[in-house]
């Protein structure tokens, strides 16, 4: 008992659910819709992205989101924020105080689960419980080949790595075995602030809805028309209810090209719309009505400077869907 009391707090296990953490509480609640932002800019300027994140925090955005893209794959041409997501979010954590910091998503099938357990718990601690870890199974063949992994087994690897990850967060000096490793007489530290880091499935992760509602804390999916998205949300809610797991939020990614004319009608684009702020407000209210809890907005593909579009959202849109704390 004395040894446990003398142990540094960051090495102690917690019984608190991840849903009590500040990042979660700011972003998710039943019946509520909040907004998130991808602060990535076309020029990749880090200081500019820090300024955008700070502006988003001040405006009342609930979260900022980044991606895990290990390699610059020639046939894809998208490198996200370029920096490793954990380094990137740690930098943003040091420059902010309340906004949630999320990944959408870490490629769990490629990650070593013990290293991921340490990095995610560390970011959780350094950010004061603001980290939200979206995870996915990955889809770029070049990355799997480069890391010596079989793309064909990424669904199974996802499940196994998620299991090891949770055991590493929640155990002390207890053996953990899996197909690619064994840990005995050792443990991963630091431990998370709560019993684990909030984990969100991004996409299907090549799993059933039942698996994801049982083993993750929520779901981030892709933009769909309102009818199709309601079908998906209702299916998710039904699975959560059947399994008795309580509230599991659903979020959506949305690319927007915000027109300067506030009354510009919505025009469909890849993964989103070109539209004015009034059409955007109408869309967001409809998304809230169908059961979505969070919308991750990307402005990087718009025609206006990101700062200008963000300022308009901050003045006219975010106040109707503010962060929850």
Residue ranges and their predicted role:
Residues 1-325:
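Active-site-adjacent structural elements that line small-molecule/cofactor binding pockets in enzymes
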